[in-house]
A protein has these predicted regions:
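Pore-lining transmembrane helices
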Residues: 1-243
Length: 244
């Protein structure tokens, strides 16, 4: 939005002010207006519908509920679907802490899993992804699911299903083991307030390794794009005028 607004020429006297104030302010107001008066209503309706649907699943059993919550938590890595699942568990942390016992794990397995994947099979990832993997593990430990976004953006068809499967596995284990998380958050940072810490930690490892192994099985080795170009240049160097 700001990039498009910069096409509007301002007087020379306002150019400096435009970059640091006018363009960002107008861009924020326009974007916020679109969300509040445009797409905000439909998105809110969808989220409310998902929340009501989750509430109706209270009697279906722990494994189906854990599977659904785990899949939703990992699906868009901090997006609207993730927020519905996490808020559903967070708002009941006082009465049903076992929900956060599972969701707390599902929150962190996507980034931790992708970080582990880069360590297990570094040839399948480029330099940027390897560096992102180190940061992803740390982000997962403090409950930030968004650490997996760079990997999903580069290869969504292989990464997102792997994140979902790992989160489902990670969510089911605490549900069945009776783990209770008394904090409305996830990751390893909440261990001090978790009842059943060993199972919680096992679930994080299990979900992370399932994600890592699955995504590495699906991905091919990464090939540097410049490799082909370097070969071509070497071939050109070997060409002589005699050959022409």
């Amino acid at each position: 939005m700001v990039k498009e607004l910069k096409r509007i020429k301002l007087p020379i006297s306002l150019k400096t002010l435009g970059s640091i104030f006018i363009y960002p302010l107008v861009g924020t107001l326009v974007t916020g207006g679109i969300i509040v008066w445009g797409i905000g209503g439909p998105i809110a309706a969808i989220m409310n519908g998902l929340t009501n649907w989750l509430s109706s699943l209270g009697d279906v059993g722990k494994v189906p509920l854990a599977s659904i919550l785990g899949a939703m938590t990992a699906f868009d890595m901090g997006g609207p679907v993730n927020k519905v699942a996490t808020l559903f568990a967070q708002t009941q942390v006082d009465t049903l802490p076992y929900l956060m016992g599972g969701v707390g794990v599902a929150i962190c397995t996507p980034p931790i899993g992708m970080g582990i994947a880069t360590l297990l099979a570094p040839k399948k990832y480029n330099v940027e992804e390897k560096e992102a993997g180190k940061a992803a593990i740390l982000m997962g430990c403090v409950g930030i699911t968004e650490g997996a976004i760079p990997f999903a953006a580069n290869d969504p068809l292989r990464v997102i299903p792997s994140l979902i499967v790992g989160a489902v596995v990670g969510n089911i284990i605490p549900f069945l083991a009776g783990v209770l998380n008394h904090a409305p958050w996830g990751g390893l940072i909440v261990l001090p307030v978790v009842e059943g810490r060993i199972w919680y930690f096992i679930a994080v490892l299990a979900g992370g390794f399932v994600t890592a192994l699955m995504v590495n099985l699906l991905k091919k080795n990464y090939v540097e794009e410049s490799a082909g170009n370097d070969t071509d240049l070497d071939d050109l160097d070997e060409i002589t005028f005699d050959e022409l």
